[in-house]
Swiss-Prot record:
Name under which the protein is recorded: DNA polymerase
PROSITE patterns according to UniProt: DNA_POLYMERASE_B
Keywords in alphabetical order: DNA replication, DNA-binding, DNA-directed DNA polymerase, Nucleotidyltransferase, Transferase, Viral DNA replication
Catalysed transformations (reactions): DNA(n) + a 2'-deoxyribonucleoside 5'-triphosphate = DNA(n+1) + diphosphate
GO process annotations (BP): DNA replication; viral DNA genome replication
Family label: Belongs to the DNA polymerase type-B family.
Domain of life: Viruses
Organism: Trichoplusia ni ascovirus 2c (TnAV-2c)
Enzyme Commission no: 2.7.7.7
Role this protein plays: Replicates the viral genome. Host DNA polymerases cannot substitute for the viral enzyme in this process.
Amino acid sequence: MNKEHLTIYAYDWRVNSVEREIYHTSDRKSKDFELHLRVYGVNERGETTCVLMNKVTTSILLEFPDNYDVETNWSRVRMELMSAIFCSTDKTDKNVVMVKKQPLYGARHDKYFCKVSFSSDIGKRAFVMRVNGTVDRGSAATANRKGGKIHQPMKFPNGLTGDMIKIHGIDVPTELQVLEELDIPPCGWIETHNAYKCATITKRFTHQYRANVKTFKYCTRMECIPPVLKTMAWDIEARIHDISSPGLHIDDEIYMMSVSVSDGKDYLLTLGPVSNEDKIRFDEDTDIKVYQTEERLLLGFSELCRKLSVVARMGWNSSRFDCKVLLARANRLNCINSVLDLGMNPPGKISTNSGRTFGPIGDYEPIYIDTEGVVCLDVMEMFKSTYTKLPKFSLQYVSEVFLNEMAIITRTPLDMVHHQKQQRRVYNLMYSECLRQNIAFQDNMFNSKKVVTNDDVVGYSGAYVKDPVPGIHRRVGSLDVNSMYPTLIIAYNLCYTTVINYDDETPYKDEDFEVIEWEDHIGCEHNPIVVEFESLKKILYPKLQQNNTPSKRSPKGDGVVSNFFLPRNNKRCITNENDDVDEDEDQDILNMVTRTKQPSIEEQRATIRYKLLKARISAMSGKRVCETQRLKVLKSSVRPGILPNVVNKLLVERKRIRNIASVPGDPVEKALLDKRQLAYKITANSIYGATGASNGKLPCKNVAKAITALGRKVIKESIQMASDKGIPVIYGDTDSMYVQLSDDLEDPWHYLQSLGDEITSNLRKPMRIESEDNISDVLFLGKKSYICRKLLKDGGISEKLDYHGGIAVRRDHSGFVKSTHNKVVHAIFADVSLQNVKHVIFEECLKLMRRKIPIDELTKTSEVKSIGDGFTLKPSMKNTTTLNSWKLGDYTVKKHPQHDTLSKEYLKRYYLEQLPAHVQLEHKLMERGRSAVEGGRVEYLMVKRPGSKKSSASNIEEITYFKENSSIIQINELHYILQLVKPITKVCEAVWERSDIVVDAIKPICAYSKVLDEMNTKLYTPLVL
């Protein structure tokens, strides 16, 4: 065979262990395993190419106890370790070596580790099992239950046993180790001069080669040339009887599937009453294929996917609906293996978004079909998570621009970038940096496989929030600490290798450290929030008993105005679902409106403050911390940390790319550069979250605590500096603050930047305060929730109101509530009086009572989650205080006392009545013969029926059914009016610190509605003689 020069854009890397036979003599042979690496990519012409790589190895790192002299005992230790190696070809001295590395955790000097290399993943797992004495990290009980062999820990010289050795790098993917060894990107152009073309090539890709993995290198000449990627989008149409378990019902059916390819070709596969499967030409770019049975339709889709040979497959909500329906129907029709075969190398497999391909999959857990050579993407998941700021969400745009850049930056294969989120990206990035700096990658320091509960987590205070000053504020400027958490890491040298507890032993001197000290008070009597909350409780609830037991509901006419937060005697069991049709809540509001005695303004303001403080105490999750915390941080002059180095590279590269993008040039190139800088920003901001995640892959709570404490210090000092200059600070939150500007400023932009520069001069480099926005008018509703009108740089004022958080961005409110809320907000920003605001509310309610509001404006939507099979219960892990709290699918219910003896049909009816009203409506619709709603959201109206009870389930109805039966069903106008109280009261509380404005506005309407209901009852109730 002749050697060829090969250049490909690699986007998918796959590793597997292959069994092989080893011939020792002519009459003796044995079996062993070796790793094969398959790389999928496209060449310069866009043709799909697969490269089979050999000579692949994987390795792990062994850490011995600090008090064990591994250097003295090395020869005997190596002998024992080699005896534990499974594959005979791996039992060589070069595969078991002693290396000197700096530990990742703690301020420590270099120490000796042992690096063990393997030619197969199977051999690596077997070695771990023999050394540690566990079955792949499982317990002895698990091994017995599964019929596995129990291995005792190995014994080493001088009393060392295998369970005392920490083994790192077990979960580092082999493909990542190969990429780092060769220093090539997981998604980009690579080349080799020693490729051999395979004699036999599968029809699923154009070219196939073999090559030694060590001959590949990064191709710099193709760095700026975008690849030609052929992609496809797909969608299914199906009849579903139960949206909670799509595709599982015997009468469910997929009747149509559509495919759109990036080259302009479209395909439509459908069921139809034809005698043969003829191909119908719709137009020159669309093919329609008709099938007689659902099974043939699914097989036709699988065959089409293999024939197209695309590099990526995209869908909308495909991981929660399309994939689940497709696999459920294929499983019922006994063609699951053929349907899974959608890639360039069979077979495909079902995988979750966490990368798990084994074990039971939850009813509501996103899944995808993992196929070699074809990246599976769900654009809806992109929209909901990482890519919410992208200007468009087409597959071609995301895969070619953003995902590629994120994969290159974080050293992560393309499919992991999308499916396994930031934890995996930071993990891969840290592994890459540790390898470069000869630092031991200690990913097994805290047994990250263990699930950390709330009781295991050591609490610490979160970010600082300065409560907003009530009212509409004119001429406000916002200052923001640019990339605060990443720059804090750099400024204070915060890292795994530098931050330690104050009392920890270290080989460094005390003068080599900087001490970070702060007070942490969470849920204790020293916390100002708790102190103020308890004082307000005594004022608002004077009848509380000495033992602090909760008081019962106050009678009508007494107590505070807003009783949304008062305890209920009949508290609902369902805790994980926002039920927008809660009749108890409506009754609470109605009682508040109709009470004869309203509290004073002082009581209202005390109540507003009480609600805010109660929400913050609830956010503490019952944690109690009362102590002075101290940490020591190694100075950067002594030893720079690895995290500051990583973050600094990301920020410097982002700044460089932004400077290049600011120069006028090709729009396509500018779009590419913009997504590159966005990828750097997201990655830098993710590092703080990775250190603080309790169940994370590389946790370091000391680093997270230090970052948060220093962040509070920075924003407090910045607020104080502005106040010392006589500039009022209206609101502050985490990394930003809003200051009051003078009306006579000629250039507010220059003034605000000058203020930011002055505050910056007191901060450590590279921290910087920048001016973010100049605001004409702003109303703060709470944390991360405000409404504003921005000031333009030409001196004008934006006509559009910007909503951040709150009702305007929520889907579960009706259009009537949203539009009324918006009209009230616009009236407030127009500086109308309090009485005029009441008039706006009254007029909108009057329109509703006169039936001048369109039905579509009254429609509400709520998400319907899974209820499983309707009767099987599981213990609720989140609500351990309630013994009678059980999980029915994704909902929490009370278990029937005779659950084990009653029939399944009775239990289904019993538990269905406990579920939210919109869930009951969804099942009612399916009983009427209507298909379930794709996407899991049901639309409904609030209605009232003659003689119906006040149960919420009987008082909501689907729109079409309402229109067909409007003569006997009426709109429940009072419900929609009462739904205005909460959101608009929140706005009025922020402006006037009063809670009775909406109540006063709707009180005549509520009284009128009550009279109408009484008249209808008297007129239409039959007389019994």
